[in-house]
Curated annotation (Swiss-Prot):
Residues 41-59, 115-208 are extracellular. The chain crosses the membrane at residues 20-40, 60-80, 94-114, 209-229. The lineage of its organism: Eukaryota, Metazoa, Chordata, Craniata, Vertebrata. GO terms for biological process: negative regulation of canonical NF-kappaB signal transduction; negative regulation of cytoplasmic pattern recognition receptor signaling pathway. It is a multi-pass membrane protein. InterPro entries: Tetraspanin/Peripherin, Tetraspanin_animals, Tetraspanin_CS, Tetraspanin_EC2_sf, TSN6/7_LEL. This is Tetraspanin-6. Gene3D superfamilies: Tetraspanin (1.10.1450.10).
């Protein structure tokens, strides 16, 4: 059995770790809310662009929403484990944090490796959407119109891309390409936006996905602190229990 003085030295350490871990867990919970919000924001703000990407790319917002939800639940569990000062619950908390960190690390590596695939996918699908524009009532036709109207652009590389489409042969340029509301005759190149949409869309996606990547990286690194604190508090509680015995 440990001396009373030894136990008195251990208790302040446990109290200190509990206080710091509670503060950390609250901040960690907030990061979950932020990731959830970023995922929803990405789904809403990039929806038109994701319509022209492959299925892997469109899953990014859902991954963030799922990760944010898991972090919120895990943060709640971590707060409960810390308040209870349960050694095994804290070890479980540290294990879950480690698992999420590894998943985020793998996801970041996969995203970095396949980043060029997004660019190629966007260009190929955009060209395909132009060729099938208004022919099948495809949802991508609506995405093309929204992008061209919002960014004041026309075609993939430039407005000439439309001249190779069936739609142009029948009706000319779509109204979403027009500089003004009245664009007739719709084969007049002077009345449509000349710049292509591909570079503009890629700039927006890279910029906004950069924000998402930065936030995700910050959250992942922040988890290392939680792993360390949860492990240290668990050890301190376990040692204190042995000292009492």
């Amino acid at each position: 059995m440990a001396s009373p003085s030894r136990r008195l030295q251990t208790k302040p350490v446990i109290t200190c770790f509990k206080s710091v871990l509670l503060i950390y867990t609250f901040i960690f919970w907030i990061t979950g809310v932020i990731l959830l919000a970023v995922g929803i924001w990405g789904k809403v703000s990039l929806e038109n662009y994701f319509s022209l990407l492959n299925e892997k790319a469109t899953n990014v917002p859902f991954v963030l929403i799922g990760t944010g939800t898991v972090i919120i639940l895990l943060g709640t569990f971590g707060c409960f484990a810390t308040c209870r000062a349960s050694a095994w619950m804290l070890k479980l908390y540290a294990m879950f944090l480690t698992l999420i960190f590894l998943v985020e690390l793998v996801a970041a590596i996969i995203g970095f490796v396949f980043r060029h695939e997004i660019k190629n996918s966007l260009k190929n699908n955009y060209e395909k959407a132009l060729k099938q524009y208004n022919a099948t009532g495809d949802y991508r036709s609506d995405a093309v119109d929204k992008i061209q109207s919002m960014l004041h652009c026309c075609g993939v590389t430039n407005y000439r891309d439309w001249k190779d489409t069936n739609y142009y042969s029948e009706k000319g340029f779509p109204e979403s390409c027009c500089k003004l509301e009245d664009c007739s005759p719709q084969r007049d190149a002077d009345k449509v936006n000349n710049e292509g949409c591909f570079i503009m869309v890629m700039t927006i996606i890279e910029s906004e996905m950069g924000v998402v990547a930065g936030i995700s990286f910050g959250v992942a690194c922040f988890q290392l602190i939680g792993i360390f604190l949860a492990y240290c508090l668990s050890r301190a509680i376990t040692n204190n229990q042995y000292e009492i015995v």
